Amino acid sequence: MRFVYGVYTWAGCAELTVYGKKNASGATALANANLEKVRMALDAGYQAPTKSVLKGAGDICLMYHSLDYDYTEKDFMPYLAYLDTDGNIKDTMFDGFLFLLSGKFPSGVAQHMNSVKTDWEWELKQVFANGKNAMALETAAAKVKKELGLADDYKFKYYLSVYYPRPDTTNFGDVDGDGVSEDCSKFEDCRKIINKNAAFKNIELAGFYWFHEAIDSSENSYKLINNIADQTKERGYDLFWIPYYCASGVSEWAEYGFATACMQPNYVFNLTTPLSNIKNAADIIKRLGMCIEIEISGDALSKDAYYRRYLEYLKGGIYYGYMKDCIHMYCVQQSGVFFQCHGKVDI
């Protein structure tokens, strides 16, 4: 007898009771119970990098910008390239970059709340501002390609965020120029709200990220996200998701239309979080065919406890197998933590 049901954070089961009967006529023999299919469903394996998912990127860094912080060409160099202590480019580093907002929108709402058209327009202007963010990534990528002799048609991947237009937002703003503000309670209006692309030579738009880290179980959310996934797919892009540890919706990620989902172990930021989060996260993502987020605290270079917590993610990659043949997404709490090692000053 097997019970399968979704259990999210702060949920559990007190008791299960099975009532059988002596008459076994019509029962399925265990040998014919298709247990191999059940086993495969519960052990899908890690999501490996492949051209069919996120256009092949395997190590994607989350690039948080804000109302008062943007990335320059110089900022991107140690993300794009492995640098020695003299700043010489020795190899590539991350091959994908996700642009997402840290903090609030200009309207004052958080990223996962009821953002409106002017917020999204501001976000696009920031991402594609001259000399900053995506534009800076393009010029930095050109330098790395030239130094390493990479093929002219090689492109680093970048991704844009889709922020949560709450279904009860009835005055989003006029997207399609028909003089009528879009109503996010209507799915046909949500289908119009798709981020824009820009033509680059050294970087390539490779997908969209659904920003909200948890999904409620309402039929409305299911339809909304699937509609957005359909829109991105029609344009040749993937929609993906990075849920927090055991967030609601994790076990149904594929049913929402995501090309992949990358779960956060959420071990590194809170010193009271148990080490078991690493193993449990690895077990869950392997069972569900997901990938993993590697997280590092901004205090890792100054406080030993946080540094050691980061090392547990790397050890877990060896112990549980997600170091190879698994997409990794990297959450850096403070800019520069991952690449301070190339500097000449002791840390």
Residue ranges and their predicted role:
Residues 57-62, 91-98, 153-161, 204-209, ...:
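Structural preference for beta-strand elements that scaffold enzyme active sites
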Residues 154-171, 176-192, 209-210, 228-250, ...:
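Aromatic-lined carbohydrate-recognition surfaces of secreted/lumenal glycan-active proteins
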Residues 206, 246, 260-275, 279-347:
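Substrate-binding cleft of secreted/luminal carbohydrate-active enzymes
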Residues 65-68, 102-104, 161-167, 211-213, ...:
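Active-site beta-loop-alpha junctions enriched in small/polar residues
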Residues 141-152, 224-238, 282-286:
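Surface-exposed amphipathic alpha-helices with a cationic face
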Residues 62-78, 215-222, 242-250, 266-276, ...:
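Acidic-and-aromatic substrate-binding clefts and catalytic sites of carbohydrate-active enzymes
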Residues 33-188:
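N-terminal catalytic cores of secreted or lumenal carbohydrate-active enzymes
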Residues 2-37:
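Aromatic, loop-rich ligand-recognition surfaces of beta-strand-rich domains
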